[in-house]
UniProtKB/Swiss-Prot annotation:
InterPro entries: Indigdn_synthA-like, PsuG
Source organism of this protein record: Chloroflexus aurantiacus (strain ATCC 29364 / DSM 637 / Y-400-fl)
The name this protein goes by in its record: Pseudouridine-5'-phosphate glycosidase
Top enzyme category: lyase
GO CC annotation terms, alphabetical: cytoplasm
Subunit composition and interactions: Homotrimer.
Signal peptide from the UniProt entry: none
A GO MF label: pseudouridylate synthase activity
Amino acid sequence: MLRIAEEVTTALEEGRAVVALESTLISHGLPYPHNLAVAEGLEAEVRAAGAVPATIGLIEGVPVIGLNGNELERLAVGGDRVRKLSRRDIGAAIVDHADGATTVAATMALAAAAGIEVFATGGIGGVHRGATHSWDVSADLTELGRTPVLVVCAGAKAILDLPATLEYLETQGVPVVGYQTVEFPAFYTPHSGLTVAAVAADALAAARMWRIQRRYHTFAAPGGMLLCVPPPERHALEREAVEAAIGRALARAEAEGVRGPAVTPFLLAAMAEETSGESIETNIALLRNNTRVAAEVAVRISELG
């Protein structure tokens, strides 16, 4: 059922480093042609660090591990025709022969099915603010608890309830590791006031943590690991400014009655307006940084064997 690119298959068979990349950024994150340029740039970051990129998505109902250039462009220009797929949506998309962009949860599931251990993304989903009333909790969190993939990110998206998200990850038994930081990043800013469970000083330390977790998965964490990389300092936003912008964005969402899956894209778009586009620049910068770190960690994992 999976179609795995020949380059990816060869790398996996030879024990070389492969990094999975999601595709929702392409179809739902940025306008064309910026989305395509960023996607191609992320793949270039992986290659520059010595690993093989595997951007994941569905093309005409077929899960593809390693989209080619034409397929990347197909998702980039597809607009509303391209479905946003979490794990629960994959089956229906296959039946309907639909094109689909994969979220963190879906990308993790497909990466694991293909034998890929490392995945780079911007920020994971989490517990939404007001979840005590809405019960809006991202499937990314439960996926991390059950699927053995090391996810490299800049924490959870800042629009979320970060303390509750960390509590949920603890409940799921997911190690939250800071990359050269003791503080859980808040996506746009390195500062959240929240601490991580462990710290990796470099890519080799992160790789060793992951190898030990997988070796002893019967009594250590059986699922994924979150490696949290602060956004690059020169692109990071001030914590106070971020919180103020989020407050205004949340008020707009409430006033307009935005609910369900529409909440996150609405809030991210509102954040871009509230910050005069700075949040988009930060998002792209942290994506590139996370991807580079993920590739370096993947190379170290392959060297450990």
